Amino acid sequence: MGKKILVLGTGAQGTTVAKRLDLEPNVDKIICADYDEAAAKELAASLNKAEGYFCNASDKNQITPLLEGCDLVVNALPLAFGKNVIDAALEAKVNYQDFAAPEGFEDTWEKCMYRLLGEYNEKFKEAGILGIMGTGSAPGTMCVVARDTMKDIDECDTINMMVYEGVEAKRFQPYWWSPVTALADMDDLPV
């Protein structure tokens, strides 16, 4: 029997994930959910295995019913909704994935990461499910590349990473993902 996957968020990232999942033979059903119900239904209508639903992710109780019978939830929502999605996934015992570590656990990103890697890591273990945060380009891909490089060197004390996601075009390009998140990233002080 194939997998049932909930994709929360039907923006650029969620749409891309849903379209890719639609091509996977081991995926039987995709639930596309968003605050913009029309966008969720439009995306679902363009796929073979999907259904579209409304979901206000600021209310964890609206996420939980969508998780019924799911094997995985892919959180492609703005970072502020991450805590609700993680808590709903833990409650429903559904595997969790996101593209960037969510907000809402602590007042700084660093404290949030310590809490996710500590307390929430234990919660995922206790629930018997997997929680994978930061699987986008940064964090995510660059961390995998850095880790893979470690096998080729004798020792390493520090790895510094710098991310620049330049977009070259002859005409104005709107933000390539969430303008709110992009502006928040630009406003952050270096760590």
Annotate the PLM regions.
Residues 100-129:
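Rossmann-fold NAD(P)-binding glycine/threonine-rich loop
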Residues 47-59:
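Rossmann-fold cofactor-recognition segment
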Residues 13:
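Hydrophobic/small residue at the entry helix of a nucleotide-binding pocket
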Residues 67, 71-76, 96-98:
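N-terminal Rossmann-like NAD(P) cofactor-binding module of classical short-chain dehydrogenase/reductase
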Residues 35-39:
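Helix N-cap at the beta1-alpha1 junction of Rossmann-like dinucleotide-binding domains, i.e.
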Residues 56-69, 81:
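Conserved Rossmann-fold cofactor-binding substructure of NAD(P)-dependent oxidoreductases
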Residues 8, 151-191:
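Active-site-lining helix/loop region of Rossmann-like oxidoreductase modules
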